[in-house]
């Protein structure tokens, strides 16, 4: 055929598909639910044309297949007809994290959804060694039943018998749309212990005191509260490492977040095991359970990283804006190690070299040219007092070369 995939509008119409062959072949329709596609021909010999008619689609996007089979030559080919719909599938959790009382009971998670819950594949992962399987098959799991009613996912949970330990579970919701594209939402549940306690809140300084250069593993149920000050979508979080002369690990930035204390005094670098575990949204106020993580001290300058933070360890997350963050303005000379990984406005700064972009590099050596020889670029910045520092910009950064002229004059950074 002269095309393998055809994308059709939601309106009814017809389509002529050229087929090139030197064989006799049969034509059959598959996955034609509702018989919305009709093909005039059932068999052809040699080059020919398929005359296809399709109906108006007042529902969700759908797909049918035209299968061509030349039995004598043991050859086959498939043509995909993807039709848009008047309706667009909606499938989005309002919040990815929820806490559960130690005594169990009902949990209600807001879910914006216009598809039938029967079309979802629902499974639950537990943090223990138990294998994940569907809710209906998992009779010994503490997540008992999941239904959907009036815009809410309703989850029934058992009490937690352990008087000390909290426990976590991940509810996986998977919807396969009419074009066979997988859409996945995950709800991370954290259940308090039998005393209905989620652990003890500790300060950032308490956690800093735990850290050492080899990494200290946290064994107690403790948690911190802070503001997320990094933007996971910017591509400019974390230091992507050049692993070889021609390769860079770009996932480091995707697995890194920065969080500061509520007063803005201290900050941590958060490292997640996978990209999917980095669910942190900029300016949101979060609570993170630290049990099972490592607190790592890095020296010269002194800074702290919390590694091994999974999405299920986020106890709560409340969306915010930049105005929610504590105001902290300084000159470069006033910066200390405590300011690392916090949100600071640097006063009266300028870029002494204003030509080009934030990354005035030969793109043939960077990711844009597929060469992966340059991970970042350092732009010089100075302030009114004569102090200077470099701004590091990763090559995957979305705004590093967007056509915007570098700012003239001086101002806040």
Regions found by a protein language model. Give the residues of each.
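A short beta-strand micro-motif common to beta-rich folds, especially ectodomain repeats
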Residues: 52, 60-72, 153, 163-178
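Predominantly extracytoplasmic/ectodomain segments of secreted and cell-surface proteins
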Residues: 1-20, 77, 88-114
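A short beta-turn/strand-edge loop motif at beta-sheet boundaries
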Residues: 23-27, 115-121, 163-164, 355-373
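Short solvent-exposed strand-capping/beta-turn motif centered on an Asx-Ser/Thr pair
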Residues: 20-24, 57, 112-118, 229-231, ...
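Extracellular Ig-like/FN3 beta-sandwich strand-entry sites
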Residues: 12, 47, 59-63, 164-170, ...
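Surface-exposed binding patches on compact interaction domains or structured appendages
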Residues: 1-5, 12-51, 113-154, 247
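OB-fold nucleic-acid-binding modules
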Residues: 86-105, 190-413
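C-terminal edge beta-strand
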Residues: 73-87, 179-196
């Amino acid at each position: 055929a002269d095309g393998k995939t055809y994308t059709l509008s939601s309106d009814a119409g017809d389509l002529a598909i050229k087929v090139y062959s030197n064989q006799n072949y049969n034509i059959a329709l598959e996955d034609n639910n509702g018989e919305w596609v009709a093909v005039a021909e059932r068999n052809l010999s040699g080059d020919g044309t398929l005359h296809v008619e399709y109906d108006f689609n007042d529902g969700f996007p759908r797909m049918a297949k035209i299968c061509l089979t030349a039995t004598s030559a043991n050859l086959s080919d498939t043509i995909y007809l993807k039709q848009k719909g008047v309706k667009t599938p909606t499938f989005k959790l309002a919040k990815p994290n929820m806490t559960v009382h130690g005594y169990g009971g009902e949990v209600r998670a807001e879910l914006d959804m216009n598809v039938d819950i029967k079309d979802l594949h629902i499974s639950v992962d537990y943090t223990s060694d138990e294998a994940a399987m569907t809710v209906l098959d998992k009779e010994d799991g503490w997540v008992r039943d999941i239904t959907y009613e009036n815009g809410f996912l309703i989850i029934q949970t058992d009490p937690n018998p352990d008087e000390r330990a909290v426990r976590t579970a991940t509810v996986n919701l998977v919807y396969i749309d009419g074009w066979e594209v997988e859409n996945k939402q995950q709800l991370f549940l954290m259940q308090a212990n039998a005393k209905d306690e989620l652990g003890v809140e500790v300060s950032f300084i308490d956690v800093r005191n735990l850290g050492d250069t080899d990494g200290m593993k946290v064994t107690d149920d403790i948690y911190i509260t802070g503001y997320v000050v990094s933007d996971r979508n910017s591509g400019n979080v974390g230091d992507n490492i050049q692993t070889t002369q021609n390769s860079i690990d770009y996932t480091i930035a995707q697995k890194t977040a920065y969080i500061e204390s509520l007063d803005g005094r201290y900050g941590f670098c958060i490292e997640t095991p996978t990209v999917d575990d980095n669910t942190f949204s900029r300016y949101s106020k979060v609570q993170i359970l630290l049990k099972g993580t490592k607190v790592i001290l890095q020296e010269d300058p002194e800074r702290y990283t919390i590694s091994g933070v999974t999405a299920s360890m986020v106890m709560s997350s409340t969306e915010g804006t930049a105005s929610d963050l504590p105001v902290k303005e300084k000159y470069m000379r006033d910066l200390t190690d405590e300011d690392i990984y916090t949100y600071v406005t640097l006063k009266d700064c300028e870029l002494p070299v204003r030509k080009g972009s934030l990354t005035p590099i030969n793109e043939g050596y960077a990711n844009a040219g597929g060469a992966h020889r340059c991970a970042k670029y350092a732009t010089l910045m100075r302030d009114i007092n004569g102090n200077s520092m470099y701004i590091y910009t990763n090559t995957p950064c979305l705004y590093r070369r967007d056509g915007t002229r570098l700012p003239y004059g001086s101002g806040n950074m």
